[in-house]
Amino acid sequence: MRIGHFQLTNCLIAAPMAGITDRPFRALCHGMGAGMAVSEMLSSNPEVWRTDKSRLRMVHVDEPGIRNVQIAGNDPDEMAAAARINVASGAQIIDINMGCPAKKVNRKLAGSALLQHPDLVKQILSAVVNAVDVPVTLKIRTGWSPEHRNCIEIAQLAENCGIQALTIHGRTRSCLFNGEAEYDSIRAVKQTVSIPVIANGDITDPHKARAVLDYTGADALMIGRAAQGRPWIFREIQHYLDTGELLPPMPLGEVQRLLDGHIRELHDFYGPGKGFRIARKHVSWYLQEHAPNDQFRRTFNAIEDASEQLEALEAYFENLA
């Protein structure tokens, strides 16, 4: 699949997830077979551009793979400025967020709230596309509510504005993450526009990935929550798409190696004073399958020292072996 002049190595993309798809996680997903990994959402508000939080969320020129930054906001001029700043710092693709269902984002008329205002959507898309000389993509939901699904209208508008790829999550904003994603709307959009369409939502295993690709005709898949604690899902899916066969479960020793490396990267990236806090949620996700009771996770979450976290994980896996 191509986005502008960029050729992805495969059709699997790691979704932007706030507080999760930071630089260490993006690099891990890339190493585990993702064709591209999108950054955490960055606000277009200029008041926060120079904060430590925004600085850490920005991509860096030495990152592996295609550097794709997602921005969010509701002011066309601010969005254009945010796009220019991120391109100057190394972004090779700009993704616009019009799919986030979070209340704090929607209250500011950003994220999926914008789907209720096609005229403003057009202004934002046009402003960003005209502001930068890199491909601009868009991520949306199927609409604001099941009664107001307008993804076909938004998709046509996006194509006319020069958007070069469109990701659609198969739920409306009012659905949040409840129920099951539906793919009829994604299929309808794919049959309507000529730009690449990326399907997103509830793609949890290789069989589901194959089924969604076949049903929707999508050009690619975006995987989010299913990669939490299981970044090797990209490798599993790609192997199945290529061969029709499932890979064996990840050996416990390999899980330990990946987890240890991920936690060390988090400690290095955020510093010892913050890295150990960020590491807690990732460890919890990794160990869901291997720690059915919460005792170790509760013990681990009480640790407030980076080196002690690594020692605790080593001891934990030794006991499992």
UniProtKB/Swiss-Prot annotation:
SUPFAM superfamilies: FMN-linked oxidoreductases (SSF51395). The keyword Amino-acid biosynthesis does not apply. It is an enzyme of class 1 (oxidoreductase). The gene is dusB. One of its GO terms (molecular function) is FMN binding. It comes from the Bacteria. It comes from Yersinia pestis. The lineage of its organism: Bacteria, Pseudomonadati, Pseudomonadota, Gammaproteobacteria, Enterobacterales. The active site is at residue 100. Catalyzes the synthesis of 5,6-dihydrouridine (D), a modified base found in the D-loop of most tRNAs, via the reduction of the C5-C6 double bond in target uridines. FMN binds at residues 16-18, 70, 139, 200-202, 224-225. PROSITE patterns: UPF0034. It catalyses: a 5,6-dihydrouridine in tRNA + NAD(+) = a uridine in tRNA + NADH + H(+); a 5,6-dihydrouridine in tRNA + NADP(+) = a uridine in tRNA + NADPH + H(+). Gene3D superfamilies: Aldolase class I, Putative flavin oxidoreducatase, domain 2. Disulfide bonds: none annotated. Belongs to the Dus family. DusB subfamily. Its EC number is 1.3.1.-. Its cofactor is FMN. Keywords: Flavoprotein, FMN, NADP, Oxidoreductase, RNA-binding, tRNA processing, tRNA-binding. InterPro entries: Aldolase_TIM (IPR013785), DUS-like_FMN-bd (IPR035587), DUS_fam (IPR001269), DusB (IPR032887), DusB-like (IPR004652), tRNA-dHydroUridine_Synthase_C (IPR024036), tRNA_hU_synthase_CS (IPR018517). This is tRNA-dihydrouridine synthase B.
